[in-house]
């Protein structure tokens, strides 16, 4: 692996993740912004972000880079980028917790946070704590001879189902509450797909990579 290939691929992957994350934020969560502001709602990429859209964008960006822009073996390069992701995601979600971007339902749970409207779940905190566990798994597997794609599979299979459940804790009684489509948030539909992808990939990447391969 060349450092330049990893670095450049990560830049394209992250950049596309931010762009598509914003597009999904507008189209899936706030379509009225498109009606009110037209194309500017899309171009203001700093004005809102969907993490699920970010995952979609990251896949698009990595495939575009390693399959089209600079053809390289896809899975080992994408997996190398993915290895660092949960460690960064912990800090991202701690930022969400600090800003209280994802206030949940009223609760007397011991980790609930006190707000003017009462004690509530804070999904940024919960997700940061869960992702710390995922990062710990990645660290434990860091020197094992895993097959390319294993870390992509591991993250998808461990993150997505828990995120699906956590979204049921999001508030629906405050202004700015997440939109629901047939009772589920847009992210929950994405997590169903990500879970399936993760499980399928795990069945293909589980086990130790053969030295002869």
State what each model feature region is.
Residues 1-213:
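A feature for loop-to-transmembrane-helix boundaries and adjacent hydrophobic helices
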């Amino acid at each position: 692996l060349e450092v330049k290939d990893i670095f450049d691929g990560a830049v394209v992957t992250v950049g596309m993740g931010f762009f598509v994350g914003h597009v999904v934020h507008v189209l899936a969560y706030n379509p009225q912004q498109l009606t009110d502001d037209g194309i500017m709602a899309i171009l203001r990429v700093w004005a809102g972000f969907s993490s699920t859209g970010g995952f979609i964008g990251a896949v698009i960006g990595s495939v575009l880079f390693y399959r089209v822009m600079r053809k390289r073996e896809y899975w080992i390069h994408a997996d190398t980028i993915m290895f660092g992701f949960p460690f960064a995601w912990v800090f991202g979600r701690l930022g969400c917790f600090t800003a209280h971007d994802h206030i949940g339902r009223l609760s007397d749970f011991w980790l609930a946070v006190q707000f003017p409207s009462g004690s509530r779940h804070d999904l940024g905190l919960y997700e940061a704590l869960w992702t710390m566990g995922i990062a710990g798994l990645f660290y434990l597997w860091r020197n094992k001879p895993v097959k390319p794609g294993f870390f992509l599979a591991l993250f998808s299979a461990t993150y997505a189902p828990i995120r699906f459940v956590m979204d049921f804790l999001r508030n629906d009684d405050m202004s700015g509450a997440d939109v629901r489509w047939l009772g589920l948030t847009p992210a929950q539909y994405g997590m169903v797909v990500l879970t399936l992808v993760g499980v399928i990939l795990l069945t293909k990447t589980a086990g130790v990579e053969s030295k002869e391969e």
